[in-house]
Amino acid sequence: MKIKIQKIHPNALIPKYQTEGSSGFDLHAVEEVTIKPHSVGLVKIGICLSLEVGYELQVRTRSGLALNHQVMVLNSPGTVDNDYRGEIKVILANLSDKDFKVQVGDRIAQGVVQKTYKAEFIECEQLDETSRGSGGFGSTGVSKA
């Protein structure tokens, strides 16, 4: 798949896959940002893109940032719809107790292109029964002692 990219900032980098088997590509910051402890910050990527109809770009946390700095994409995965033409920006959350400094060119998130599907919603009076029923939030992962 070919994705058209428009650089709108002089520091913008065209995304690339780091290895043959990578499903995600790095997204790079175009400006310095300091995110205070237990706060969020918006990081500009400096590119706009055009995806084919039926696809989205998911913006995801880089595992190294999460493990080593306790920094994550707040709305992970963030969704960039195929009809969006504005600048890609990433909401980062700093869960640590110290400032997190983003430098120009830092790899701050990863993008993954995913196929999307349009559902048809059908109203009904009652849903089919399942063994889970209406159990939610932890209902299948914790043993009851």
UniProtKB/Swiss-Prot annotation:
Write out the pathway annotation from the protein's UniProt entry.
Answer: Pyrimidine metabolism; dUMP biosynthesis; dUMP from dCTP (dUTP route): step 2/2
Q: What is its EC number?
A: 3.6.1.23
Q: Which cofactor does it need?
A: Mg(2+)
GO terms classed as biological process: dUMP biosynthetic process; dUTP catabolic process
Spell out the Pfam families in the cross-references: dUTPase
Q: Which GO terms describe its molecular function?
A: dUTP diphosphatase activity; magnesium ion binding
The catalytic activity, as recorded, is: dUTP + H2O = dUMP + diphosphate + H(+)
CDD domains from the xrefs? trimeric_dUTPase
* Domain of life, per lineage: Bacteria
Alphabetized, the UniProt keywords read:
Hydrolase, Magnesium, Metal-binding, Nucleotide metabolism
Q: Report the top EC class in one word.
A: hydrolase
Which InterPro entries does this entry report, sorted A to Z? dUTPase, dUTPase-like, dUTPase-like_sf, dUTPase_trimeric
Where, in this chain's numbering, is substrate bound? 62-64, 75, 79-81, 89
UniProt function note: This enzyme is involved in nucleotide metabolism: it produces dUMP, the immediate precursor of thymidine nucleotides and it decreases the intracellular concentration of dUTP so that uracil cannot be incorporated into DNA.
Show the NCBIfam families listed in the entry. dut, PRK00601.1
Q: Please state which protein family the record places this protein in.
A: Belongs to the dUTPase family.
Q: Which PANTHER family match?
A: DEOXYURIDINE 5'-TRIPHOSPHATE NUCLEOTIDOHYDROLASE (PTHR11241:SF0)
Q: What is this protein called?
A: Deoxyuridine 5'-triphosphate nucleotidohydrolase
Q: Which organism is it from?
A: Helicobacter pylori (strain P12)
Q: What is the lineage of its organism?
A: Bacteria, Pseudomonadati, Campylobacterota, Epsilonproteobacteria, Campylobacterales
